[in-house]
Amino acid sequence: QEILENIPLEHMQLTSDIITYAKKNLNVQLNQSIYITLTDHINFAIQRQAQGIQLKNALLWEIKKFYHQEYLMGKYAIDLLNEKLGTKFSEDEAGFIALHFVNAEYDTTINDTFAMTNMIQGILELVKQEMDIEFDEESLHYERFVTHLKFLAQRLYRHELLKDEEIEFAKLMENKYPGEYECSKHIAEYIEKEYGGQISGEEIMFLAIHI
């Protein structure tokens, strides 16, 4: 509540309109905290712009690719703000706003969301190199794989990883698809080394299925 005390009413109303639009178009449950966090973010972004400060979004490309619907909500937000307030927000800011919707959707922090986005990109690069393939980013298989990686990252940060319950099927996968299974084990090693998380044999098996 204290955060909102010094924020202009117009900024609060515009943020509320943006969230209402996003709820309708994303068709997901959003954590109620977004009303405070996004209002604070937008107010601060307006202040920064008034001072001539522009922030580059280092993850903009990844956000547009992995969280495209949330990015479109961010784009709607900057278009509305630019129209109503005369600001000149770029798509960098649309990306930052998109992350707030990702946080509210997956119930994570902004730092976790940055880390999860980097992790997904790192895994995709690893698979491309190990399997010597190029992804068709328009394909349903690619979309399903990215969706699986998003939920894997979410489970990792929530400490809700799958337990080893499909041991026999995992062995079958390892024997039938040794290359894909080996690649999945390398993904597990990458996650442990870079993010300190250990994933189960069942998680490795599901990665192999998608690969």
Each model region followed by its residue ranges:
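A cross-family "folded-core" feature that marks the main globular domain of proteins
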Residues: 1-211
